[in-house]
From Swiss-Prot:
Task of the protein: Negative regulator of class I heat shock genes (grpE-dnaK-dnaJ and groELS operons). Prevents heat-shock induction of these operons.
One Pfam family of this chain: HrcA
Keyword hit for Transcription regulation: yes
The species this protein was found in: Brevibacillus brevis (strain 47 / JCM 6285 / NBRC 100599)
Source taxon at top rank: Bacteria
One example of a Gene Ontology biological process annotation: negative regulation of DNA-templated transcription
Keywords from the named record: Repressor, Stress response, Transcription, Transcription regulation
Descriptive protein name: Heat-inducible transcription repressor HrcA
N-terminal signal peptide: none
Family assignment from sequence similarity: Belongs to the HrcA family.
Amino acid sequence: MLSDRQQMILNAIVDNYIHSAEPVGSRTISKRDDIGFSSATIRNEMSDLEELGYLEQPHTSAGRVPSTKGYRFYVDNLIQPHLLEETELGKLKQLFAERILHAEQVVEYTAQILSQLTNYTAIVLGPEIFEHRLKHIQIVPLNAEQAVAIVVTHTGRVENKLIDLPEGIGAGEIEKLVNLLNAKLTDVPLWQLRQRLYQEISGEMQRHTEQYEEILQLLNNSLTQEEERVYLRGATKIMNQPEFRDVDKVKDILELLEQHDQLMNVIGMQGDGLTVRIGQENQLDAIKQCSIITTSYSLGGKPVGMVGILGPTRMEYGKVITVLNHLAEGLSRMLTSQFEK
């Protein structure tokens, strides 16, 4: 456990770096009114914090920056409640005072307000993603080259999609593998289908057919969900951050933001309630320099969607968490009052 002095210094470094985007030196910290230690003492403690893995030293600077471990300690132990300004509260009140006919419209407005208030990229999973679970899938060949994939949910929703058939794939083989798919994925939420396909079924398919890759791609295409269920606002705001002004650094992030199925997996795997994933804690390489904060919203007490923020690891965690909590609570109340049956 860090000493009280180390915690004070780490808190000051994180706070300073969040607002300056510049590596922090001991002299900078010693000038703060809330720090009563000499520059030499701070320098020694910073060296210890670096050795313990809470700070890192960029090659081109004598200052330090927080590591993933440092940010994690800050979020879990040091973060202070953030008070929203009157103008920010006003935007939230205005959003939830509106009478809106469609749940999707509410969610779309939520993403817009979330991005405006935080100045980061907002990602919202609409209610439909969580409401629908697979009942069964059929793939009906039309000819040697094309088929119709039919996905039926437990709520009775039916989705049809025209797909191309791999060369040489017979109807019998397709039927056998679709039966395997139904046996393994029945009752799985639609947004999880593609992830579960690769996790649970790909190995078994490889044992059943030499055209494993072609069949896997066929099923993958059949399960692709419509993109409008992911609401994304402020996608390019990541480029406003100093650490992402290099196009090469931000390219992979922007490409990820265009892949809504990937975003559904990234946001959906966070879990219900407030979750913070920082830097290297993220599984995808594209966002290992980013943090993702999410929370769920509900309808009638049942979680039906997620709201989230993607930003640099150097994000204003206190403000983002406060905004997300306000939005999730307000969105849950609004959806419940207007759409609960």
